[in-house]
A protein has these predicted regions:
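S-adenosyl-L-methionine
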Residues: 1-57, 67-74, 96-119
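Conserved beta-strand/loop positions that form the S-adenosyl-L-methionine
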Residues: 61, 84
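Class I SAM-dependent methyltransferase "Motif I" SAM/SAH-binding loop
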Residues: 62-66
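Conserved SAM/SAH-binding beta-strand->alpha-helix loop
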Residues: 87
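A short glycine-rich, Lys/Arg-flanked "PGG" loop and its adjoining helix->strand segment in the class I
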Residues: 145-160
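Conserved beta-strand signature within the Rossmann-like core of class I S-adenosyl-L-methionine
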Residues: 161-169
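Class I S-adenosyl-L-methionine
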Residues: 175-223
Length: 223
């Protein structure tokens, strides 16, 4: 019998008071940091896969064990779905497969975003499914929307638009903050409860089985 998952506990019950300040500062500054060698090596795997079979891309950032990446490949059969996670331990739990419709990379997500932008590679769909919520108020800048790499996320589709982005979390505040950050960047979208359906990730299944409310932000690119 599985132990129920705990709800997110935070000393920040509402939107962070410095959210707009932090997001706007990052949007003005942009982002450029040295890419870690292991991330650069992982990106070469992606370039090789595209050279062998050119396809549009779907990105599954913070993919964990890659369960979601395989599921997304079934949803996007005309794309190469790329799952990225920094943890070799988590990725090692993915069942061995000879699948060619998805690729798992051990790399820092911000590094991969930076390399995609630098190489002019666009992403049609970008999924951020249950990233670490960093629930302490002091950790705002560790959250996706509070991190310095947030501007890269906005440049991952053709024409410099963010493509179709979907973020899910079991912490409503996190999703609402992400939605506001996207709005500040000029990208329309909506926040809503996630409707019932097959779980895309193992966390999603566990949270739903534990009775958590699940939340989703979705954005449609303006082509």
């Amino acid at each position: 019998m599985h132990t129920p998952s705990r709800q997110v506990v935070s000393n920040q019950p509402y939107l962070h008071p410095r959210l707009a300040e932090v997001v706007l500062r990052h949007l003005r500054a942009g982002y450029e940091k040295p890419v870690a060698p292991h991330s650069a090596a992982a990106f070469e795997q992606l370039l090789q896969a595209l050279a062998a079979a050119p396809r549009p891309l779907v990105l599954d950032s913070f993919c964990g064990t890659g369960h979601s990446t395989a599921a997304l490949a079934r949803c996007h059969p005309q794309h190469l779905v790329v799952g990225v996670d920094k943890s070799a331990r988590r990725l090692a739990r993915h069942p061995h497969t000879a699948a060619t419709d998805y690729l798992l990379l051990q790399a820092d997500c911000a590094d991969i975003w930076q390399l995609l932008v630098a190489h002019g590679l666009s992403v049609d769909y970008h999924y951020l499914l249950y990233p670490n919520p960093w629930p302490k108020a002091a950790h705002l800048q560790r959250r996706v929307h509070g991190h310095g790499s947030f501007p890269l996320l906005l440049r991952l589709a053709a024409g410099g638009t963010p493509g179709c982005i979907e973020l899910r979390s079991n912490w409503q505040v996190y999703v609402e903050e992400f939605g506001i950050a996207m709005h500040l960047a000029g990208v329309p979208g909506r926040v809503a409860r996630l409707p019932s359906g097959p779980a895309l990730t193992l966390f999603e299944r566990k949270y739903r089985d534990s009775g958590h409310d699940l939340w989703c932000y979705s954005s449609i690119a303006r082509r």
